[in-house]
Design a protein with these regions (language model features):
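Active-site-adjacent "lid/gating" segments in soluble enzymes
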Residues: 23, 27, 87-233, 237-238, ...
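Aromatic-enriched alpha-helical interface/lid elements that frame and gate functional surfaces
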Residues: 220-293
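Conserved small-residue-rich beta-alpha loop and adjacent elements
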Residues: 2-39
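Eukaryotic N-terminal low-complexity, Ser/Thr- and Lys/Arg-rich leader segments
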Residues: 1, 378-382
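Flexible, small-/acidic-enriched active-site or ligand-binding loops
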Residues: 318-368
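Glycine-rich phosphate-binding loop and adjoining beta1-alpha1-beta2 segment
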Residues: 26-58
Length: 382
């Protein structure tokens, strides 16, 4: 796999950091999750499969010294804490990159490491709001609607951070030294929205209130419709040639339903039409055509769809949980899902990792007794 041989330390946190670490792990990196000694995100971290866990008390010298030894053998550190947290423990970039000049110190935060909001708490909805993108989501005459915590947390945050890490690794192959990555979820979300910012003056695309433009459900030919069996079909017939095919499959002429006129009237007609057949019946009509009409699948049904099944996009676990396989697909060195490996328990690999660092058994026993490490035998406070 492309990242084989890359060692990553992931300081335990909420979803964006674990997602970043998961991407690196699924493409070959060896990832150690550094948990707080008695505080575990294990119950809510669904992205820790294939990682190892060491539980350390970083607030005491013995714990931070162990962490420094890990850093000395690592290529990447993922830091999800607010600005100043690592510095107060003397584990900031200046200290750690002094130990390991090749270290890539990836700092993944909501608002970034400087600016008036840098030290504020926040979540996906807050970062998306500040990026300007939240203002685009929602129906006409309705308030902005958050599209679950996908854009800022995972795309603008975890994925963008992983991209930065890969860029830094590539640059290091030439310079021989690491660097600090400031991966802000506001920055990342805004950058994801580059096309929206740059297309504001494209004729016909924007210029109307939210929910009244071509790409935000403002038209009848770019929307979703309920079917007879309470499922949904989505329509994205933007180009005129595709719109003609769409109408043809419905048995409607362009004179009856012109593309760029009477949007609401046409939407009402389509709502009635789509309720006349089930989702499966509509798929039988539109599949294999250029009408740009596809079913809206739920998370349980995606694996059984013919297209997804042939491409092996998803896998179904023994417990029935459906999960996606790694993307993109590399022809020689593809990623590999770690889902078959269970999520590591807090401190489960502490002894194993310390042994690799040449700690003796009696030293490990003393570290446990002194509350410096946790090897997973105690109950964690959630």
């Amino acid at each position: 796999m492309p990242l084989k041989g890359i060692n990553v330390l992931e300081l335990a946190g909420l979803a964006p950091g674990p997602f970043c670490g998961m991407i690196l792990a699924q493409f070959g990196a060896s990832v150690i999750r550094v948990d707080k000694i008695y505080e575990s995100y294990n119950a809510i971290d669904c992205l820790g499969h294939g990682k190892r866990s060491i539980a350390l008390n970083l607030k005491v010298n013995e714990g931070s010294n162990i962490f420094r030894k890990l850093v000395n053998q690592s290529d990447v550190l993922i830091d999800p804490y607010r600005p100043g947290v690592m510095e107060r423990m003397k584990l900031g970039p200046e200290e750690l990159m002094g130990i390991n000049k090749k270290l890539i110190y990836a700092r993944l935060t909501g608002f970034g490491h400087n600016g008036p909001y840098a030290n504020m708490a926040g979540h996906d909805i807050n970062y998306l709001a500040l990026s300007g993108l939240l203002s685009l989501f929602g129906r006409h005459n309705q308030k902005p609607t958050p599209p679950v915590n996908l854009v800022a947390d995972f795309a603008g945050g975890g994925l963008m951070c992983a991209f930065g890490i890969v860029l830094a690794l590539f640059e290091r192959s030439k310079s021989g030294i690491g660097q600090v990555i400031d991966a802000s979820m506001v920055d990342g979300s805004a950058y994801l929205g580059s096309w929206f910012f740059r297309s504001q003056n494209v004729p016909g695309l924007w210029g109307n209130p939210r929910g009244k433009n071509i790409l935000d459900s403002g038209t009848h030919f770019y929307d979703t419709y309920e079917t007879k069996d309470k499922q949904y079909m989505c329509v994205g017939a933007i180009e005129s040639k595709f719109y003609e095919i769409f109408l043809e499959k419905l048995g409607i002429s362009s004179h009856e339903m012109p593309q760029f006129e009477n949007f609401e009237e046409s939407r009402e007609k389509l709502e009635k039409i789509f309720k006349q057949k089930t989702q499966a019946e509509w798929c039988a009509i539109f599949d294999g055509t250029d009408a740009c009409v596809t079913p809206v699948l739920n998370l349980k049904d995606v694996a059984s769809h013919a297209h997804n099944k042939e491409r092996n996009i998803f896998k179904t676990e023994d417990n029935g949980l459906v999960t996606p396989n790694p993307a993109p697909r590399l022809s020689r060195t593809p990623g590999m899902s770690k889902k078959h490996e269970r999520n590591a328990k807090l401190g489960e690999h502490t002894t194993e990792i310390l042994t690799e660092l040449d700690f003796k058994p009696e030293e490990i026993v003393n570290l446990i007794a002194n509350g410096i490490i946790n090897q997973g035998m105690k109950h964690s406070k959630l």
